[in-house]
């Protein structure tokens, strides 16, 4: 079983994530999706003065048209452009899923756990690396027998080399935990249907039927999740949809949202 491997990876992530978190606490939040360089004090004061005047101007005059959110400058929350398109989400023709950016809420004071972890009763780890991530979540709840939805985007700020390693390790740990689903939920049976180094699709059968997709976009230190499930036999049949199409739809927005991160 790979449960021990997942735990070892998680333990390794703890030190890495703590270092990343402490480094970010020491940064002024002039974040450009990279480590901030050192600036002379005069330049900092001049920049603050100009920024203050610019802010006052922007507050006084309404914007004609808002620019799409990207990182930078929007790096302390999930950019609106990072979410999967509603039209690419399975069952959209039946459920008319909401626009993800408009329905997303920030995940704070809680670990942004993946949807399968609740179904599989995956144990929580102390000092989870995801605690250091900027995260947003969309949840659509329906009655039993109807498909429900969870979408999440997690982003680690700072140096993308280090953040990318964290994203890749969290992804690997998640895949191992999903494969070990029956350790916590014997009645649930996982099956990985697309197994790639940084992309995964799986079906979990049992009392809860679940389809889950997970992408680690290492070059932007970001993970995107899409999970749909039905508690009890679903009244709407699952459509024929290629795993790769959904995974591609999760990946593409990250390249646009996090400027400077190659596909």
Predicted segments, located by residue:
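Methionine residue identity
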Residues: 1, 22-25, 36
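Low-complexity, intrinsically disordered or signal/transmembrane-proximal segments
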Residues: 10, 29-31
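Secretory targeting and sorting signals
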Residues: 18-19, 31-66
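N-terminal "mature-domain start" segment
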Residues: 66-137, 259, 263
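Short Gly/Thr-rich strand-loop-strand
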Residues: 96-106, 110-111, 168-211
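A short acidic-to-branched-hydrophobic micro-motif
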Residues: 133-165
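A short, solvent-exposed beta-edge/loop patch
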Residues: 185-263
